[in-house]
Amino acid sequence: MTKKDKKAKGPKMSTITTKSGESLKVFEDLHDFETYLKGETEDQEFDHVHCQLKYYPPFVLHDAHDDPEKIKETANSHSKKFVRHLHQHVEKHLLKDIKTAINKPELKFHDKKKQESFDRIVWNYGEETELNAKKFKVSVEVVCKHDGAMVDVDYKTEPLQPLI
């Protein structure tokens, strides 16, 4: 398969319908996730999106020489080094890539929260913005757990109703 054939395919994802009837897209690859967001922005469907990404951060795969079997057991929320590197990855790469994908490089994610418990760390990022005269809220939740290096990202956009 040539690179051209690979690019012709859409992002690899699965669609799940939640109990409340909401359609949820689930990704296992960061690149596919970003490609999907870019496509939704181009299709004008950007203000009502809910998708999840479950992946190993690039710095973890790099340390394991791109072999998930070689990921150290210490790469989890109990490791200060892992948490520090993950936070840097989220702030400097993931959020930046999301801004680029939805064509909003000036997005700042002012609404930031961090919740820590014994078994997980959760970072929440949120911001209200506007694109093509549509106001919407972007929410990103990043979770790392105590039992592995897999990171869960929950990306959600909701339209904001104008006040009348």
From Swiss-Prot:
Entry protein name: Respiratory growth induced protein 2
Gene3D superfamilies xref list: Respiratory growth induced protein 1
Keyword Cell cycle assigned: no
One Pfam family from the record: RGI1
Swiss-Prot/TrEMBL induction comment: Up-regulated under carbon limitation and repressed under high glucose.
Family: Belongs to the RGI1 family.
Statement: the UniProt record of this protein carries the keyword Cytoplasm: yes
Function noted in UniProt: Involved in the control of energetic metabolism and significantly contribute to cell fitness, especially under respiratory growth conditions.
Disulfides per UniProt: none
Miscellaneous field: Present with 5530 molecules/cell in log phase SD medium.
One Gene Ontology cellular component: cytoplasm
Any GO BP: energy reserve metabolic process
Keywords, in A-Z order: Cytoplasm
Source organism of the structure: Saccharomyces cerevisiae (strain ATCC 204508 / S288c) (Baker's yeast)
Location(s) in or outside the cell: Cytoplasm
InterPro entries documented for this protein: RGI1 (IPR022554), RGI1_sf (IPR038235)
